[in-house]
Amino acid sequence: MALPGNFLCCLLVAWLCDPGLGVPLAPAYGAPAVGQFWHVTDLHLDPTYHITDDHTKVCASSKGANVSNPGPFGDVLCDSPYQLILSAFDFIKNSGQEASFMIWTGDSPPHVPVRELSTGSVIEVITNMTVTVQNLFPNLQVFPALGNHDYWPQDQLPIATSKVYSAVSDLWKPWLDEEAISTLRKGGFYSQKVASNPDLRIISLNTNLYYGPNIMTLNKTDPANQFEWLENTLNSSLRNKEKVYVIAHVPVGYLPYATKTPAMRQYYNEKLVDIFRRYSSVIAGQFYGHTHRDSLMVLSDKNGNPINSVFVAPAVTPVKGVLEKETNNPGVRLFQYKPGDYTLLDMLQYYLNLTEANLKGESNWTLEYTLTQAYGVADLQPKSLHGLAQQLATIDSKQFLKYYHYFFVSYDSSAPCDQRCKTLQICAIMNLDLVSYEDCLKRHL
């Protein structure tokens, strides 16, 4: 897919246009007792998106499929038009919410065949997304993580420096210090203190090294020495009495819509789970993307005690495959934490009703739910989420119906989930390692 030469110019012109902002419906928190940060993921910009009478040529990401209902903010068979991404960031900028920082967990390029992209075009898309964020949020520290599509060929992120690693190291310099830039350039990962909260460290992992389709890391026990680096970094944070938020693209654990399928290779998943268990007192939260769905997980120790909260954020892109029945509405989210110990207090999930936005020609981003209010839990701590998971697992759980509706970001309230479907969801929420996950399936399937 050749990107037009005047692409960046077009982006900046679009940026000056008002995409139509929704009224933020989140509660106002005037007291400084609550800190906040945004999480955005899976932008998947498709620069070819345009409205045309030939619905097989609306976007490269539809791969020639007939796009039935294209509008200014996209279509479910297409990745994001720039106007959709801009509307998301404009909503964040004008939401009235004060945030200390933003995490951005990867995947800027579109889902298109390998031959339609190149290293240059992938870097160009990442550049344009970075420039958009930096222009809209010049004073906000942003912590990116690389996704499996943030490379060419897709998924093949290497164990040593590359053109993409070097390019993002230069692009993200305004947000990171020299040490972070150095490890990012070498292996696509880094750690960085939050400027406004110096005892909080962000660890941005390159979990794409552990992704099944990545042939560059086959038969390697510690690709790019990231495991060793991670343990050293967490040990240092433990000694220095820091708290850590772990961010990455591909999550730990099992996919909630598949059977016995970890999001990454089994060996690597077990290794990460082991590290996270040993340093659970340091890690105050884990945040991922990749699945395009809204889900949570609770990491437990080997005795079944909940020790870590894990959040997988839904995508901004609404894209789905032709044969898929369900997809997601575009979403972004805001986390609230307790300054000092960085305990996660709440999460506010915002979304765009894509059908409505296209009909009206304006984007009305609204609050989909506030986690504590939606589920009646005290906070986002592991014990609270473990209790919620137990509620979700009960027979005829109304809480689970709500959870499954939010899983697709309120895309389709009639989406069915039979007993097998529910079991896969519950087992994925509560079991991140092989032994406990398989035991869960044996007990419930």
UniProtKB/Swiss-Prot annotation:
<dbReference type="GO" id="GO:0160049">
    <property type="term" value="P:negative regulation of cGAS/STING signaling pathway"/>
</dbReference>
<protein>
    <recommendedName>
        <fullName>Cyclic GMP-AMP phosphodiesterase SMPDL3A</fullName>
        <ecNumber>3.1.4.-</ecNumber>
        <ecNumber>3.6.1.15</ecNumber>
    </recommendedName>
</protein>
<feature type="binding site">
    <location>
        <position position="249"/>
    </location>
    <ligand>
        <name>Zn(2+) 2</name>
    </ligand>
</feature>
<keyword id="KW-0732">Signal</keyword>
<dbReference type="GO" id="GO:0016887">
    <property type="term" value="F:ATP hydrolysis activity"/>
</dbReference>
<dbReference type="InterPro" id="IPR004843">
    <property type="entry name" value="Calcineurin-like_PHP_ApaH"/>
</dbReference>
<feature type="binding site">
    <location>
        <position position="111"/>
    </location>
    <ligand>
        <name>ATP</name>
    </ligand>
</feature>
<dbReference type="InterPro" id="IPR017064">
    <property type="entry name" value="ASM-like_Pdiesterase_prd"/>
</dbReference>
<keyword id="KW-1015">Disulfide bond</keyword>
<feature type="disulfide bond">
    <location>
        <begin position="59"/>
        <end position="78"/>
    </location>
</feature>
<dbReference type="GO" id="GO:0008081">
    <property type="term" value="F:phosphoric diester hydrolase activity"/>
</dbReference>
<dbReference type="InterPro" id="IPR045473">
    <property type="entry name" value="ASM_C"/>
</dbReference>
<dbReference type="InterPro" id="IPR029052">
    <property type="entry name" value="Metallo-depent_PP-like"/>
</dbReference>
<feature type="glycosylation site" description="N-linked (GlcNAc...) asparagine">
    <location>
        <position position="353"/>
    </location>
</feature>
<feature type="disulfide bond">
    <location>
        <begin position="427"/>
        <end position="440"/>
    </location>
</feature>
<feature type="binding site">
    <location>
        <position position="107"/>
    </location>
    <ligand>
        <name>Zn(2+) 1</name>
    </ligand>
</feature>
<feature type="signal peptide">
    <location>
        <begin position="1"/>
        <end position="22"/>
    </location>
</feature>
<feature type="glycosylation site" description="N-linked (GlcNAc...) asparagine">
    <location>
        <position position="235"/>
    </location>
</feature>
<keyword id="KW-0479">Metal-binding</keyword>
<feature type="glycosylation site" description="N-linked (GlcNAc...) asparagine">
    <location>
        <position position="219"/>
    </location>
</feature>
<comment type="subunit">
    <text>Monomer. Homodimer; homodimerizes following 2',3'-cGAMP-binding.</text>
</comment>
<comment type="similarity">
    <text>Belongs to the acid sphingomyelinase family.</text>
</comment>
<feature type="glycosylation site" description="N-linked (GlcNAc...) asparagine">
    <location>
        <position position="66"/>
    </location>
</feature>
<feature type="binding site">
    <location>
        <position position="44"/>
    </location>
    <ligand>
        <name>Zn(2+) 1</name>
    </ligand>
</feature>
<feature type="binding site">
    <location>
        <position position="149"/>
    </location>
    <ligand>
        <name>ATP</name>
    </ligand>
</feature>
<keyword id="KW-0325">Glycoprotein</keyword>
<feature type="binding site">
    <location>
        <position position="148"/>
    </location>
    <ligand>
        <name>ATP</name>
    </ligand>
</feature>
<dbReference type="GO" id="GO:0008270">
    <property type="term" value="F:zinc ion binding"/>
</dbReference>
<feature type="binding site">
    <location>
        <position position="290"/>
    </location>
    <ligand>
        <name>Zn(2+) 2</name>
    </ligand>
</feature>
<dbReference type="Pfam" id="PF00149">
    <property type="entry name" value="Metallophos"/>
</dbReference>
<feature type="disulfide bond">
    <location>
        <begin position="417"/>
        <end position="421"/>
    </location>
</feature>
<dbReference type="GO" id="GO:0005576">
    <property type="term" value="C:extracellular region"/>
</dbReference>
<dbReference type="GO" id="GO:0005615">
    <property type="term" value="C:extracellular space"/>
</dbReference>
<feature type="binding site">
    <location>
        <position position="148"/>
    </location>
    <ligand>
        <name>Zn(2+) 2</name>
    </ligand>
</feature>
<feature type="binding site">
    <location>
        <position position="292"/>
    </location>
    <ligand>
        <name>Zn(2+) 1</name>
    </ligand>
</feature>
<keyword id="KW-0964">Secreted</keyword>
<dbReference type="InterPro" id="IPR041805">
    <property type="entry name" value="ASMase/PPN1_MPP"/>
</dbReference>
<dbReference type="Pfam" id="PF19272">
    <property type="entry name" value="ASMase_C"/>
</dbReference>
<comment type="function">
    <text>Cyclic-nucleotide phosphodiesterase that acts as a negative regulator of innate immunity by mediating degradation of 2',3'-cGAMP, thereby inhibiting the cGAS-STING signaling. Specifically linearizes 2',3'-cGAMP into 2'5'-bond pGpA and further hydrolyzes pGpA to produce GpA. Also has in vitro nucleotide phosphodiesterase activity with nucleoside triphosphates, such as ATP. Has in vitro activity with p-nitrophenyl-TMP. Has lower activity with nucleoside diphosphates, and no activity with nucleoside monophosphates. Has in vitro activity with CDP-choline, giving rise to CMP and phosphocholine.</text>
</comment>
<keyword id="KW-0862">Zinc</keyword>
<feature type="glycosylation site" description="N-linked (GlcNAc...) asparagine">
    <location>
        <position position="364"/>
    </location>
</feature>
<feature type="glycosylation site" description="N-linked (GlcNAc...) asparagine">
    <location>
        <position position="128"/>
    </location>
</feature>
